Amino acid sequence: MPRRRVVATREILPDPKFGSQTVAKFINHVMSHGKKSTAERIVYGALETVSQKRNIEDPVSFFEEVLENVRPMVEVKARRVGGATYQVPMEVRPSRRTALAMRWLAEAAAKRSEKSMALRLAGELNDAADGKGNAMKKRDEVHRMADANKAFSHYRF
């Protein structure tokens, strides 16, 4: 962490198809090895597949809804107190909530067994909308950890 100055947050331009900053951020999360056009094709293909499957006119609002389902409210952070390390539950700030949700969705989709990444992502988005899937499992696991360590909440930073 820099001691001198706070680094300015980069402005993310909205994506070309939907004009949404959220979708643009998610494309960046899906992107690997700098292949943005491939990531765009994957995300747009997944949103197209989901909107056809569920008869949705606005895939962006559906995506926002899915993100809201996956966003964690609390997480645990390690804190050393007198030689012991405690897992202290803390509230997650809004920007990190979104980033974690996007990361979990992308990782969960990559681990699925469908043929193409677009189909995997579509399946994961579908499952997350229904409250299932690995991304939701990850969120529930984080919430469970925070709940189990509620006794240490007075050690907050």
UniProtKB/Swiss-Prot annotation:
Q: Tell me the superkingdom of the source.
A: Bacteria
- The answer on whether this UniProt entry bears the keyword Transmembrane reads no
Which keywords accompany this UniProt record? Answer: Ribonucleoprotein, Ribosomal protein, RNA-binding, rRNA-binding, tRNA-binding
What terms describe the molecular function in GO for this protein?
rRNA binding; structural constituent of ribosome; tRNA binding
Q: Name one GO biological process term.
A: translation
Q: Which GO terms describe its cellular component?
A: small ribosomal subunit
Q: Does the keyword Ribonucleoprotein apply?
A: yes
Cited Gene3D superfamilies:
Ribosomal protein S7 domain
Q: Which is one Pfam family of this protein? A: Ribosomal_S7
Question: Known InterPro entries for this protein?
Answer: Ribosomal_uS7, Ribosomal_uS7_bac/org-type, Ribosomal_uS7_CS, Ribosomal_uS7_dom, Ribosomal_uS7_dom_sf
How does the record describe its quaternary structure? Part of the 30S ribosomal subunit. Contacts proteins S9 and S11.
The family this protein is said to belong to: Belongs to the universal ribosomal protein uS7 family.
PANTHER family found in the cross-reference section? RIBOSOMAL PROTEIN S7
Q: What does this protein do?
A: One of the primary rRNA binding proteins, it binds directly to 16S rRNA where it nucleates assembly of the head domain of the 30S subunit. Is located at the subunit interface close to the decoding center, probably blocks exit of the E-site tRNA.
Name the UniProt record assigns to this protein: Small ribosomal subunit protein uS7
Q: Give the species this sequence originates from.
A: Psychrobacter cryohalolentis (strain ATCC BAA-1226 / DSM 17306 / VKM B-2378 / K5)
Q: Which gene encodes it?
A: rpsG
